[in-house]
């Protein structure tokens, strides 16, 4: 188990370029299974979750070539479906929640999809019902093996259908779209997720020959086609990383420029950080954050009540950045209510921040009130463990702003979502050491 030793309290300076979007990568990589032609993907992040998925695809029989940093070609012209029943696949699939995304492509192209109950972050219940309800509506037969915790779907030929999703699940929407592109007839998905990740997947599929309409809306129409061709696709910058670096700059009162952010795909993210009092300047496609030497002040609502930041389906605020907002608010002037609607365990890392001196009231598993300190006294260094990707990066930011040397255990959780995090922070002047 790896460990980070962080000497906090240092001002950082410089520029940083966000990695490719993790959540998009996990989807578009699975889409290569939909064709026997070569697919080339650029800007793939070098992180644990993505590398595990690439390994899984290779074990399934996908021919993979690394063409350069972040660029790979994939050709799924000799898939070994029997691998799905192997103990090795069971182990691989359990270790990666993103493995659920292979089911739609395999089901529509080969007539079978099989997956063990996936792993991932321990952040509460994360149901897979949306995925399998969609496959069933397309004509698949579903079975769940309670003894081995495995899901399977089979179908001779999927048929298009109308469906109203119970929840606007990002991965559920994408999985159903991938299953529907080769189905017979027309599929209509209402209450579809419309995050940039889903939009990018749809654009990639259309480039491969799919017929998807309504991209960017919550009403998606897919006219099935007989086959898909190859394509070249570039993954967007990771908006979660961009939000993390904005929070890092504010908490450490550092001057940082975030390069090539893909501003048009950031949605409400910049606005939320501005409501926390953080100022920045858009320069072409870069974000320049000045050193907040005088701190930052949370904006109340116009009636004087305290600000609430809550997650919501796109174009609402992504739940993956609530932990960053929470930690940034600990050193702001003012108060904010954080409302995590989607997951009931994502706020359970705040005890570590309280140990560091933060003033936070956990109202219930979904809500916490943060009373900002306004940099009147720095957070205190401490020992802590990273429970998941997003809490891990929030604790790392807290440690970089704290006085003294902090230790973070279980940093593999951070590595799952952030590429070369310690090396990139060192380039900004951070005092961080990785210990094996």
Where are these regions (language model features)?
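Short, structured segments at the rim of ligand-binding sites
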Residues: 1-436
């Amino acid at each position: 188990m790896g460990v980070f030793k962080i000497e906090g309290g240092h001002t950082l300076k410089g520029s940083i370029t966000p990695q490719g979007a993790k959540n998009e990568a996990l989807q578009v990589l699975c889409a290569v299974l939909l064709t026997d032609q070569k697919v080339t993907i650029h800007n793939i992040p070098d992180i644990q979750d993505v590398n595990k998925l690439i390994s899984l695809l290779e074990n399934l029989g996908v021919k993979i070539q690394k063409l350069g940093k972040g660029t790979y070609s994939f050709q799924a012209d000799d898939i070994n479906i029997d691998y799905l029943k192997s103990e090795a696949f069971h182990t691989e699939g359990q270790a990666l929640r993103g493995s659920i995304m292979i089911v739609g492509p395999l089901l529509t192209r080969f007539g079978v999809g099989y997956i063990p109950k996936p792993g991932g972050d321990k952040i509460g219940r994360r149901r897979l019902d949306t995925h399998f309800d969609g496959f069933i509506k397309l004509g698949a037969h579903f079975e769940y093996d309670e003894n081995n915790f495995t899901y399977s779907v089979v179908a001779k030929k999927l048929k298009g259908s109308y469906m109203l999703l119970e929840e606007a699940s990002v991965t559920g929407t994408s999985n159903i779209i991938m299953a529907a592109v080769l189905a017979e007839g027309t599929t209509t998905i209402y209450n579809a997720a419309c995050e940039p990740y889903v939009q990018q997947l749809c654009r990639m599929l259309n480039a491969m020959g799919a017929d998807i309409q309504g991209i960017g809306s919550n009403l998606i129409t897919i006219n099935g086609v007989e086959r898909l061709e190859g394509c070249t696709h570039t993954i967007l910058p990771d908006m979660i990383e961009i939000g993390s670096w904005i929070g890092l700059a504010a908490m450490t009162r550092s001057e940082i420029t975030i390069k090539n952010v893909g501003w048009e795909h950031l949605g409400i993210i910049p606005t939320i950080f501005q409501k926390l009092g953080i100022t920045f300047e858009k320069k072409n496609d870069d974000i320049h954050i000045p050193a907040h030497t005088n701190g930052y002040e949370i904006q109340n609502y116009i009636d004087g009540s305290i600000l609430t930041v809550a997650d919501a389906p796109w174009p609402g605020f992504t739940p993956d950045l609530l932990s960053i907002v929470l930690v940034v608010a600990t050193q702001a002037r003012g108060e904010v209510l954080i409302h995590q609607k989607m997951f009931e365990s994502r706020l359970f890392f705040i005890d570590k921040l309280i140990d560091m001196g933060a003033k936070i009231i956990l109202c219930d598993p979904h809500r916490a009130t943060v009373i900002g300190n306004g940099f009147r006294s720095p957070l205190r260094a401490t020992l802590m463990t990273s429970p998941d990707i997003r809490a891990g990066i929030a604790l790392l930011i807290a440690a970089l702003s704290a006085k003294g040397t902090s230790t973070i255990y279980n940093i593999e959780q951070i590595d799952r979502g952030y590429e070369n995090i310690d090396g990139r922070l060192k380039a900004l002047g951070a005092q961080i050491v990785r210990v094996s």
